[in-house]
């Protein structure tokens, strides 16, 4: 599975941005752009229990779209957010929705449409995880599942419905899904939804929603039909366009190790360190707690490692990074928070002990800025639960990640 070539052609960031701007020429009177940037989740004015959910999910520092996109959505503005898939759009609108829900009212207040069953279920999972400490009730209404079960859950009451257009329209028509309290409507992957022929259904659904409703459109591109939707349904939307980072995966050999279960990762890591002569390496995990856990485990097995994460004060982090850069410490365990700050040019090996929670961060962990063009090796530990994310990463970057060969020592 993981070695199969992703669909699509080589992604060209400049061409993408140019096309986007061509389509939007002459649209300026319609959009206002929103340029406020919030560099941390704490600075966004989010409620405490939502922040707990965000950090527990493994997010530490907001991605570019999250820095710009969460706050205007929380303010109730109509928003059009354009960024490639995998840049953290899902968590952006999930946070905006969760911040505005009235949890004392167990009625559907937000409706999210997605083009595929898989994406709808993935959004449901993220919404539920981020809203864990808020007690959010979310349900995915998708084709291919029991209509009766949908009706039962909707009648019992949920705060958020995520679904595909066909099933959602059906539930609205049957009045199993009541629209009276819906105040937020999100179209995710709008371009994909329109290319799949859902335009009429989206219009039909919109007719059944209350007249005063906040609309969020999230899309990689803005084809004319998507612009038409925004003109019809949105009021003074703000447009947020995120440019890509100039990083490259060129020259980096990427492999995966099938570890099956989470519990087997530690043994796999220790085996690797015993068979390889590694000059310097960075190991990425998804939470601060895991940094501490893995550091203790590695030290107890006599591996010399240093660790850094967001709970440490800046001074401590600077000292650890200085030691790492000077080569006096050779293995660094860290989280995504520092992926962008590590000058990994001298690092020959990056290990994703945990795959990143969003594809965008994969590039920040293992990519190099083009002017250095150093070679390197990246090894991804993949459990059964990670297979989907590995597929998404390959598709997102148009790369093939091969299974780790037995002669890996020769590659370093």
Curated annotation (Swiss-Prot):
Keywords: Acetylation, ATP-binding, Cytoplasm, Helicase, Hydrolase, Initiation factor, Nucleotide-binding, Phosphoprotein, Protein biosynthesis, RNA-binding. It is an enzyme of class 3 (hydrolase). CDD domains: DEADc_EIF4A, SF2_C_DEAD. Its EC number is 3.6.4.13. It comes from Arabidopsis thaliana. PANTHER family: ATP-DEPENDENT RNA HELICASE DBP3 (PTHR47958). The modification Phosphoserine is found at residue 104. Residues 251-412 form the Helicase C-terminal domain. ATP-dependent RNA helicase which is a subunit of the eIF4F complex involved in cap recognition and is required for mRNA binding to ribosome. In the current model of translation initiation, eIF4A unwinds RNA secondary structures in the 5'-UTR of mRNAs which is necessary to allow efficient binding of the small ribosomal subunit, and subsequent scanning for the initiator codon. It catalyses: ATP + H2O = ADP + phosphate + H(+). Belongs to the DEAD box helicase family. eIF4A subfamily. It holds the Pfam family DEAD. Residues 70-240 form the Helicase ATP-binding domain. The modification Phosphothreonine is found at residue 145. Highly expressed in the whole plant. This is Eukaryotic initiation factor 4A-1.
